[in-house]
């Protein structure tokens, strides 16, 4: 498959199984579908833009705001444990995570970032619940106006992308479940 096989106006459209045409059908999420969104508190002014963009994109595609539960944790390091508990609860079809890990000069931020991403991957593989990461680790981050503006805008993009990935993955899993029985 190539990238054009997945493109359409709706982020959770999928190709008809067994169809040779390029016709796409939209698979809305079941009404009982719930999604958890976890956000870290560090750099909340920046990270909250990712949450806002995620919620706006989900709303744009018909997902009610009351179908998304919001959770806030102190830092990115706390995200994987919360993601695991939420995924294990059986209440959520997906868990979306948003945070910013920066080099504060005291510890190796790349170790923290690696632990977070590895933890999130483990959660989804162990539980079967998809976990999406908008946990970003910039190579260089300084709290001056240029970086603050750039990352504030970048989280808008990442929040929207997380919503689209979430919708596409849930639709794909729904389709796969129907095919596999």
Give residue ranges: language-model regions.
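C-terminal binding/interaction regions
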Residues: 109-181
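Glycine-rich phosphate/diphosphate-binding loop of Rossmann-like nucleotide-binding domains
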Residues: 25-73
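Glycine-rich oxoanion-binding loops at beta->alpha junctions
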Residues: 71-89, 136-137, 141
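Structural motif
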Residues: 36, 69, 78, 93-95, ...
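Glycine-rich phosphate-binding loop
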Residues: 78, 82-120, 124
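Amphipathic, non-transmembrane alpha-helical secondary structure
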Residues: 52, 77-84, 88, 160, ...
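N-terminal amphipathic/basic leader segments beginning at the initiator methionine
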Residues: 1-31
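Short, ordered loop/turn segments at secondary-structure junctions
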Residues: 41-42, 100-101, 136-140
